Amino acid sequence: MKNYVTVMMVTLVMTGCDKPDALAPFSPEMASFSSEFNFDPLRGPVKNFTQKLVNDSGEVETEVNGTLSQEGCFETLNYSDKPSNSHLALVLDANYYLDAISREKRIRLQGKCQLAELPAVGMVYETNDREFVVKGHTSEVSTTYRYDDEGYPLGKTSKTKDAELSTVATPSDTRKKHDYSSVTTLNSKVIDTAKQSCEYDRHLNPSSCVLEITDASVTPPVLHKFTIQNEINYY
């Protein structure tokens, strides 16, 4: 949801019939879109979802809404960030995602429905043999993306001529991926740390989370607390 915020997942009692859904991997499209557009990836046959990041004053700071096809392609994706007063609304149309209002081509796709290019900023993406986006570059910035064996995003590193911004996320549980800690550095100096724990549904997707972010770029460091609310519907 934010560059330093990747979100969700803590206590689930599983039954034997839940295991196939719980172990479903993260699709290349879900993992790659969540890495690039700062929301939390979900696994399994997701039909639609809403993720809200709520601050300790009870205000919704960011909200992401998505609808997916049965093949796992995003049909619509909406993102709003109230602190920065920014909003993005995308709709799938053949090999592009269009601005839902202006119908301008925002994202070019490759393969089934994977990121290929952001024409407006000149960002071009590269995928690996598993179809996950692993690199992105413009004329001034290059970014590498990392995932675990199940496709869960482990962070990304962006480099310019004079700076390197990197986030490394480490899940604390091999199954409950959204219980994690992360460290973000700028030119090898820690600027924030985060820790998250969540409640999970039967697909091992987060239903709610508590996120604590420590801003280490100021003295003394400042702790920010958030809750994350998820509404998820499945096929």
Protein language model features and the residues they cover:
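Sec-dependent bacterial lipoprotein signal peptides
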Residues: 1-15
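Buried hydrophobic residues that stabilize the cores of well-folded domains
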Residues: 17-235
